[in-house]
C-alpha cells in the first residue's frame, strides 16, 4: 500500500490525500493568511509589558494545561525507552546541573512525543515540539529556583509569545527548525524569571537567534529531541552572554541592530532564502 498526504501553510490544513493512487481529498490551497490569526502586532517590548500586567485569569487555564500536560509527557520520556533517549542521555552524571535539567526535560518530552507516546501536549504555533520547548525549560527553572506560581505563569506568557512572534514572520511550516524559535522563547522566559525585562530579554533573543538559526527542519522524528536540546542551550547561552556583558552586534552575520530588525531578518531568510531548501529536503527524504 502507498499513501500521499499534502499539508500547506499550517499543520492541520490538509489539501490532498491519496491512497494507492486514489484521490480521497483534494481542495484548493488557501492563502497564507486564510485560517490563521494575524499576530503582526507583536513586539518583544509589548510582550514584556503584557506579561507584567495581564490579568492571569484570562490566560491561566491554558497555561495550567501546558504545565500539566507538557511536564507529564516529559516525565514519561524519562521513564520510558523512546527513540534515541536524548533526554536521559543528557542527564547522565549531571543530575544536579540546572541547565542540564532544563535541556533534559524538554528533550525527554520530545523523545516520547516523536516516538509513539500518545499523551497530550499543549502546542505553540501549531507544533507540539514548539509548545514543549517554549514551556518545559521555564517550568523546570521556576521549580528548581523556588519561583512563585504567578511568576511562572507570567514567564510562560513571555516564552510562548516570543516564540509566536518569531514564528509569525517565519510561518508555521518551513525548512527552518521550529525548535530554534521556541528555544529563543524559553531563554526569554527564563530571563524574565531571573528579573530581566525588555533590555535583558531583547539581548537574549538576538544572541540566541545568532547561535542556532542554521538548523533545518527535516520532518518529525527522533532527532527533533536533540535539536530541542541544542535550541534550549542556545537560549540559555544568549542570556548568559548578556549577563556577563557580552553580545552579538548588528553586522555579525544575519544579526541586525535591534531585536525587531533581527527577528524580521530571520523571517525574510526563511520565507525567501529557504524556499528551495524546503523542496530539496523533501526530495531527499523521499529518495529510496
Where are the language model's segments positioned?
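Flexible glycine-/small-residue-enriched beta->alpha junction loops
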Residues: 1-49
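Functionally critical mobile loop/hinge segments
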Residues: 41-95, 101, 190, 195-288
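Acidic-glycine-rich active-site phosphate/pyrophosphate-binding loop
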Residues: 97-116, 148-166, 205-214
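Glycine/charged-rich beta-loop-alpha catalytic/anionic-binding loops adjacent to active sites
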Residues: 113-123, 163-173, 216-221
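Conserved phosphate/anionic-ligand binding catalytic regions in large, soluble enzymes, centered on
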Residues: 117-136, 177-181
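Active-site cradle of extracellular carbohydrate-active enzymes
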Residues: 126, 138-143, 149-157
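Alpha-helical support elements that line or immediately flank enzyme active sites
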Residues: 131-147, 187-195
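C-terminal structural cap/anchor segments
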Residues: 172-173, 177, 181-202
Amino acid at each position: 500500500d502507498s499513501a500521499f498526504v499534502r499539508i500547506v501553510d499550517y499543520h492541520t490544513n490538509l489539501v490532498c490525500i491519496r491512497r494507492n493512487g486514489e484521490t480521497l481529498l483534494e481542495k484548493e490551497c488557501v492563502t497564507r493568511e486564510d485560517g490563521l490569526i494575524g499576530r503582526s502586532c507583536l513586539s518583544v517590548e509589548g510582550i514584556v509589558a503584557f506579561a507584567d500586567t495581564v490579568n492571569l485569569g484570562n490566560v491561566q487555564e491554558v497555561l495550567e494545561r501546558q504545565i500539566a500536560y507538557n511536564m507529564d509527557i516529559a516525565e514519561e520520556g524519562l521513564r520510558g525507552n523512546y527513540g534515541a533517549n536524548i533526554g536521559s542521555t543528557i542527564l547522565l552524571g549531571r543530575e544536579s546541573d540546572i541547565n542540564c535539567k532544563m535541556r533534559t526535560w524538554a528533550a525527554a518530552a520530545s523523545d516520547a512525543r516523536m516516538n509513539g507516546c500518545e499523551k497530550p501536549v499543549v502546542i505553540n504555533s501549531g507544533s507540539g515540539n514548539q509548545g514543549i520547548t517554549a514551556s518545559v525549560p521555564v517550568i523546570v527553572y521556576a521549580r528548581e529556583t523556588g519561583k512563585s506560581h504567578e511568576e511562572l505563569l507570567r514567564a510562560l506568557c513571555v516564552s510562548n509569545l516570543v516564540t509566536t512572534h518569531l514564528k509569525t514572520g517565519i510561518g508555521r511550516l518551513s525548512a527552518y527548525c521550529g525548535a530554534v524559535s521556541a528555544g529563543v522563547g524559553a531563554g526569554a522566559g527564563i530571563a524574565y524569571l531571573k528579573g530581566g525585562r525588555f533590555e535583558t530579554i531583547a539581548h537574549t533573543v538576538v544572541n540566541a537567534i545568532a547561535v542556532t538559526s542554521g538548523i533545518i527542519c527535516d520532518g518529525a522524528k527522533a532527532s527533533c529531541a536533540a535539536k530541542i536540546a541544542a535550541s534550549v542551550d542556545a537560549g540559555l547561552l544568549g542570556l548568559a552572554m548578556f549577563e556577563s556583558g557580552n553580545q552579538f552586534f548588528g553586522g555579525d552575520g544575519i544579526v541586525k541592530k535591534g531585536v525587531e530588525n533581527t527577528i524580521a531578518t530571520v523571517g525574510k531568510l526563511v520565507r525567501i532564502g529557504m524556499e528551495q531548501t524546503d523542496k530539496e529536503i523533501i526530495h531527499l527524504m523521499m529518495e529510496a
